[in-house]
């Protein structure tokens, strides 16, 4: 069976999903899994994230170091999720155990953008046009901005 995904935004979408489930013939030897969850972050949210991370990476020195956008992403997701740190395999450093942003729900991703905005604003980051528009859009539309 192929994977089906329904984004439910209206009663019509809901009925389409219900109809699809009703068409499945149950087979005890091949169970089907139905998952209902909030949508993961959108590509638009991801683009906004990288615009903001790029601005922070170019303008904020962190404990005497300039971090790239990818490293800042790790710092922010660790702060948001209060993640753990474990020694690396060689024993000469540490690894942050955390959550991938691609697996974040829309609301979690919105929290991440809010955290980055607050952090950057506290440190005087001058937001690029793309990041500024992303943050203004988030402020205006909230979680619906995705």
From Swiss-Prot:
Top-rank taxon of the source lineage equals Bacteria
Q: Which SUPFAM superfamilies match?
A: NinB (SSF103370)
- Ranges in coiled-coil conformation: none
> InterPro entries attached here?
NinB_sf, Recombinase_NinB
UniProt similarity note: Belongs to the ninB family.
Q: What is this protein called?
A: P21 prophage-derived protein NinB
Which species is listed as the source?
Answer: Escherichia coli O6:H1 (strain CFT073 / ATCC 700928 / UPEC)
């Amino acid at each position: 069976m192929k994977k089906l995904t329904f984004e439910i935004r209206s009663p019509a979408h809901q009925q389409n999903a219900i109809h699809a489930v009703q068409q499945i013939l149950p087979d005890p030897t091949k169970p089907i899994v139905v998952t209902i969850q909030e949508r993961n972050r959108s590509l638009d949210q991801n683009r906004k994230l990288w615009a903001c991370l790029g601005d922070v990476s170019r303008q904020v020195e962190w404990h005497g170091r300039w971090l790239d956008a990818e490293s800042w992403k790790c710092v922010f997701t660790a702060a948001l999720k209060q993640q753990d740190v474990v020694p690396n395999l060689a024993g000469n450093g540490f690894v942050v155990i955390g959550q991938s942003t691609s697996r974040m729900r829309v609301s979690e991703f919105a929290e991440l953008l809010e955290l980055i905005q607050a952090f950057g604003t506290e440190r005087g980051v001058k937001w690029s046009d793309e990041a500024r528009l992303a943050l203004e859009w988030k402020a205006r539309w909230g979680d619906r901005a995705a």
